[in-house]
Amino acid sequence: MKLSEVKKYCSIPLEIIKDCEFEYTYLIGKALKKDKVISFVGSPKFVDGLYNYETEGVICTKDVYEVIKDTYTGGIAVAENAKTAFFEIHNYLGTQYEENEETYIDPTANVHPTAIIADKNVHIGKNAEIYAHVVIKEGTKIGDDVIIREGTVIGGPAFYYYGEGDGRRLVTSTGGVVIGNNVELHANCIVEKGVMFENTVIGDNSKLDNCVVVGHDTIIGKNCTVAGNALFAGGVNLADNVFVGVSASVSPNVEVGTGAKISSGAVVTKNVPEGMQVSGNFAVEHKSFIQHIKSI
């Protein structure tokens, strides 16, 4: 589709400076996993990021256009509020790419009668155990030998809004959830679906304790162990064999290396290298944290 074809779905004026064809919306700053994407830039201070990614076009403000007009070769559309225009187009695209496949539950799976499973676009693998009051929404794929305990909700929309004040609107979550084989989710976990046509993923053999929140587009690797009340904000990336302690929280887009450990109660705001243990609020290397505690 073209920018000129979707401008009618914006509630604010959108001036097409140069048209382009595209397929997906995507946010600058995240690794591109789709071809033919458009993004938005709402301030000149973020212009440099535009040149680090291969985009078909951009929605931008007038002041951003003045900066990029002689150097950016893709399509350009100008709006007073580029972010709002971008997400309104994104929400429209979400209605165009909806799948419509009948839900499949393997005959060997055991699903409690009080569980609520969407009629469309869900796949549940062999020998899965779905306990009472579990909710599984559209766009969820669950592997073999998975256990999902009471009250867990999988595939709900991301907590992701655009706009200001009483004009805030929910961004349509156009991705899904993929859960690998031999995964266990204990009671009352929340797993949000991806926002930008990508999936939230929990890898093979990972185990999540009660009340863990897995934000949109988070990737939890294989063989990870996550204790109760841990929280992963959007876009977190855990490599394999990571341990996360009780009530730890990990900020958006943080990357945690293979075999790393996050101590109980830690607030992680920076990337964690492979094999490192971090502790504290804000989290630092565990040895440094202990030395600091001893010094006070």
Locations of regions flagged by a protein language model:
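Structural signal for interior beta-strand "rungs" in well-ordered beta-sheet cores
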Residues: 40, 104-285
